[in-house]
């Protein structure tokens, strides 16, 4: 077994405390009863116990649980997706009420089988949550929806509080990590979102540990800022299974702190960086920080 394919042992700083209190079990039961999915479970997020048990937050995953893409880092199931569930937006909105969320993140599997990439259901979910939860801030995390401008406009017209779209990795590694998504297309998606709704903060995320260099990461930060992205999250890539891309490096907390300082020096309004940081980690704090800085500028 070569160093490139070795299933590396996680360092101490990546070990997490499991907490399965009544908040955790209650949320799990509610999701099952409403036939809803969360990216927390489907993508095997390491923060699920903190978010569900302590912070009582969750990221809803709409448009089913089967993705039409097969990115080599992702644990979400791939294959032929299910039919659209047109009642899903209302069930998500009802769940936000039941959970008493102040901030909700709505993401989705990629639906390349749909002409609009799922934009209509995405937009209706935003509107449904807004109707039933007028004081809840809403963050959306869509795929690139095929790079079709009309699809993005449909979503942005629903006026989410924050638009999040992840480039996932650096330019040099993008084709290997997510072959059916394109680095430049993601940058264009983020740029267009800001052009359509200048007052809505935009956000993106990068995983580290896939073989990128410091120079690669700085280039990616510059690319995001050149396309007016406001918020950046940086987290450690964790190999979901031996079928996925291997971890080539575990970044220590101190290196994440350095990367955060670099990101802030580039002009990002907020940067969340750490071994266990994921795109939706402390999302409520990120959107609040971005809005405060926008209001003060």
Curated annotation (Swiss-Prot):
Reactions this protein catalyses: [[Fe-S] cluster scaffold protein carrying a second [4Fe-4S](2+) cluster] + N(6)-octanoyl-L-lysyl-[protein] + 2 oxidized [2Fe-2S]-[ferredoxin] + 2 S-adenosyl-L-methionine + 4 H(+) = [[Fe-S] cluster scaffold protein] + N(6)-[(R)-dihydrolipoyl]-L-lysyl-[protein] + 4 Fe(3+) + 2 hydrogen sulfide + 2 5'-deoxyadenosine + 2 L-methionine + 2 reduced [2Fe-2S]-[ferredoxin]
Superkingdom of the source species: Bacteria
One annotated Gene Ontology cellular component of this protein: cytoplasm
Keyword Metal-binding in annotation: yes
Domain Radical SAM core residues, every copy: 53-269
EC number: 2.8.1.8
Single GO molecular function: 4 iron, 4 sulfur cluster binding
The protein's required cofactors: [4Fe-4S] cluster
Keywords on record: 4Fe-4S, Cytoplasm, Iron, Iron-sulfur, Metal-binding, S-adenosyl-L-methionine, Transferase
Pathway per the UniProt entry: Protein modification; protein lipoylation via endogenous pathway; protein N(6)-(lipoyl)lysine from octanoyl-[acyl-carrier-protein]
UniProt keyword annotation of Metal-binding present: yes
Family (UniProt): Belongs to the radical SAM superfamily. Lipoyl synthase family.
HAMAP family the record matches: Lipoyl_synth
Protein name: Lipoyl synthase
Native source species: Bacillus cereus (strain ATCC 14579 / DSM 31 / CCUG 7414 / JCM 2152 / NBRC 15305 / NCIMB 9373 / NCTC 2599 / NRRL B-3711)
């Amino acid at each position: 077994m070569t160093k490139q394919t070795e299933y590396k042992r996680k360092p101490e700083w990546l070990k997490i405390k499991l907490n399965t209190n009544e908040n955790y079990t209650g949320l799990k039961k509610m999701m099952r009863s409403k036939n809803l999915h969360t990216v927390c479970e489907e993508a095997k997020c390491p923060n699920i116990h903190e978010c569900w048990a302590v912070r009582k937050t969750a990221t809803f995953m709409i448009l089913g649980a089967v993705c039409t893409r097969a990115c080599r880092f992702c644990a979400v199931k791939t294959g032929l997706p299910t039919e659209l569930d047109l009642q899903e937006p209302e069930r998500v909105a009802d769940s936000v009420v039941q959970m008493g969320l102040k901030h909700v993140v709505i993401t989705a599997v990629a639906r390349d089988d749909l002409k609009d990439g799922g934009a209509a259901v995405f937009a209706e979910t935003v509107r449904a949550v807004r109707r039933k939860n007028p004081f809840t801030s809403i963050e959306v995390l869509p795929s690139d929806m095929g790079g079709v401008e009309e699809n993005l406009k449909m979503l942005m017209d629903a006026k989410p509080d924050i638009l999040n779209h992840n480039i996932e990795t650096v330019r040099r590694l993008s084709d290997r990590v997510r072959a059916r998504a394109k680095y430049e297309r993601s940058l264009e998606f983020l740029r267009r979102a800001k052009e359509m709704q200048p007052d809505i903060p935009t956000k993106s995320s990068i995983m580290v540990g896939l073989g990128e260099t410091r120079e690669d990461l700085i280039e990616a930060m510059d690319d995001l800022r050149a396309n007016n992205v406001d918020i950046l999250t940086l987290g450690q890539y964790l190999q979901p299974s031996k079928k996925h891309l291997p971890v080539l490096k575990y970044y220590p907390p101190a290196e994440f702190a350095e990367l955060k300082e670099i990101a802030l020096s580039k002009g990002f309004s907020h940067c969340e960086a750490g071994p266990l940081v994921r795109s939706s980690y402390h999302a409520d704090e990120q959107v609040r920080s971005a809005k405060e800085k926008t209001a003060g500028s």
